[in-house]
Amino acid sequence: DLLTTIKRVKESMKRRT
């Protein structure tokens, strides 16, 4: 799912400082 992927990527980017 694109939405799921975007959500995961968003979370990953947020965790990446």
Curated annotation (Swiss-Prot):
Organs and tissues of expression: Expressed by the venom gland.
Keyword set includes Signal: no
Keywords for this protein: Amidation, Secreted, Toxin
Protein name according to UniProt: Cupiennin-7a
GO CC terms of this entry: extracellular region
Similarity comment: family membership: Belongs to the cationic peptide 04 (cupiennin) family. 07 subfamily.
Main location, first listed in the record: secreted
Organism for this UniProt entry: Cupiennius salei (American wandering spider)
Cellular localisation: Secreted
Keyword Secreted carried by entry: yes
Modification Threonine amide occurs at: T17
Gene Ontology molecular functions: toxin activity
